[in-house]
Amino acid sequence: MPATQTLCYNCFRQVADPSAPCPHCGFDLAENRQKFPVALRAGTVLNDRYIVGRVLGQGGFGITYVAFDTQLQARVAIKEYMPSDMATRVEGTTVSVMMDTRAEDFTYGAERFQEEARTLAKFIGHPNIAGVSSYFDQNDTSYFVMDYIEGVSFKSYIANNGGKVSVDETLNVMIPVLRALTAVHAEGFIHRDVTPDNIYISKDGNVKLLDFGSARYSIGDKSKS
């Protein structure tokens, strides 16, 4: 396993000073930490295998990190179950429910998170779905490991093109998304959060559907029942 204290936590190349912007990719660790204060510290090792890197994004019910798989020597994405309205971080790693009255909701959400992982594991190799390759529990919460996609969200792509795209460009993105949804629906699973933020265009032009968000909506459904 590489020495984590000398790594850039984005590209995972060796650097002289990880606290300074990376000379290879420009990543600024201090800026990322400031933006996501409840996230795991970069350099944390999960499941004796994955070195946690920068935060890719944080939603109401989870945090997604880029990580380095020390067995495969490759970057992956790891999603952590961390519902921000009912849990907090203790001692830098452990996830703890803030109030006993929310313990049932936390557990219910964790079950839906696990269901999402099991479902996505069925789609390893699908060209338009970021499949799950591994799942594990640690720090009193749950994690799953996904393909790391280097590219831009459809939302960013639209913004970078002046806020609009042509019909042909839209079809080139949405037809693969519909293929992904067809495959997922055939397994009885519903995405329920298809937004430009959750559609990614990789550097080679491939379109991937991300973040099935089952925990978020299932908890909402439970609270209304």
Residue ranges, per PLM feature:
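Conserved short submotifs of the Hanks-type protein kinase catalytic core
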Residues: N139-S153
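Protein kinase glycine-rich loop
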Residues: G53-G59, T64
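Activation segment signature within eukaryotic-like protein kinase domains
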Residues: V173-M174
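AlphaC helix of the protein kinase catalytic domain
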Residues: F154-V165
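Protein kinase catalytic-loop region centered on the HRD/HxD motif
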Residues: L178-F189
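Activation-segment/catalytic-loop signature of the eukaryotic protein kinase fold
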Residues: Y135
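AlphaC helix of the eukaryotic protein kinase fold
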Residues: V90-K122
